Amino acid sequence: MNPIVFSTILTTAIMGTVIVMMSSHWLMVWIGFEMNLLAIIPILMKKFNPRAMEASTKYFLTQATASMLLMSAIIINLMHSGQWTITKMFNPTASAIMTSALIMKLGLSPFHFWVPEVTQGISLMSGLILLTWQKLAPMSILYQIAPSINLDMLMTSALLSILVGGWGGLNQTQLRKIMAYSSIAHMGWMTAILTYNPTMTMLNMLIYIMMTLTTFMLLMLNSSTTTLSLSHTWNKTPLITSLILIIMLSLGGLPPLSGFIPKWMIIQELTKNNSIILPTSMAIMALLNLYFYLRLTYSTSLTMFPSTNNMKMKWQFENSKQMSLLPTLIIMSTLLLPLMPTMSILN
């Protein structure tokens, strides 16, 4: 792709997301979503092949359907209230349709079907954009309309997402699909706490993006897309392979790694609101997610066939501008737990 064309498309995608996040008018929100959608399709299809075309088509159809539902909710709300302001959504029908549209855009269950398939069909860089940047705009709208949202629908979707995110990743050997199911589960945790403490949702999103960014950067550095290819890199780049596995355990929420912080804080916040069954169910379902990360770590590092290796091992990162942030991201993705007392200001 021509660099000028690619820069223009990327700028349009970024502008679309920024417009959604900064707008208080429903029409501008819808325009921002459409700008972002039309610009992100060529980015997903940057490596032009049949699988990328199929994945991009699935993504386009799903997001277009969600945009149609979004506009329907906006029109229904406008007919009943006469308001275009985001925060003024009082009609229950409009609220339910809006919740469904945003759930579909985020890839939450039961509209999660597109996330693993689309992520698997595109490159690692496109997958990183899909699972991080593309979550910001819908989550920002959920954050703004949290007081008037359909709570029952949102909590049901959150619980189903945590369950599906753990259950779906159990038999996967493709690392991109594993990351996709992990994303579904994390989105479930974020939406579960949204109506109780929206600020905590944003903190969870920040930690999730940081860990996902680190994982994808290491996978790109290692050129690994399957569990088999990851295990084959152990003799060549043991440091990078070890870091990938540690950060994946952090994504699973294993203490004392950074990924444990949001789960701990969310469970604590839910119990403060006299909710016992919900956090207990979430904690039990999160064990499925942690299990497949532990199994991946075990099969990759502890069940290797003993062999003599005459290759030179790479114990240092190659110098490159793209990887200059990587050491900082690795530290933050694994060692944030000592900052936990500082985060008590959210309570």
UniProtKB/Swiss-Prot annotation:
Any single biological process term in GO: mitochondrial respiratory chain complex I assembly
Membrane spanning residue stretches: 3-23, 25-45, 59-79, 111-131, 149-169, 178-198, 201-221, 242-262, 274-294, 325-345
Family, as annotated: Belongs to the complex I subunit 2 family.
Binding partners and assembly: Core subunit of respiratory chain NADH dehydrogenase (Complex I) which is composed of 45 different subunits. Interacts with TMEM242.
Membrane topology according to the record: Multi-pass membrane protein
One Pfam family per UniProt: NADH_dehy_S2_C
GO cellular component labels: mitochondrial inner membrane
Any one GO molecular-function label of the UniProt entry: NADH dehydrogenase (ubiquinone) activity
UniProtKB keywords: Electron transport, Membrane, Mitochondrion, Mitochondrion inner membrane, NAD, Respiratory chain, Translocase, Transmembrane, Transmembrane helix, Transport, Ubiquinone
Compartments where located: Mitochondrion inner membrane
Origin: domain of life: Eukaryota
Name this protein carries in UniProt: NADH-ubiquinone oxidoreductase chain 2
InterPro entries to which the protein is assigned, alphabetical: Complex_I_Subunit_2 (IPR050175), NADH_DH_su2_C (IPR010933), NADH_UbQ_OxRdtase_chain2 (IPR003917), ND/Mrp_TM (IPR001750)
EC number: 7.1.1.2
Known function: Core subunit of the mitochondrial membrane respiratory chain NADH dehydrogenase (Complex I) which catalyzes electron transfer from NADH through the respiratory chain, using ubiquinone as an electron acceptor. Essential for the catalytic activity and assembly of complex I.
Reaction(s) this enzyme catalyzes, per UniProt: a ubiquinone + NADH + 5 H(+)(in) = a ubiquinol + NAD(+) + 4 H(+)(out)
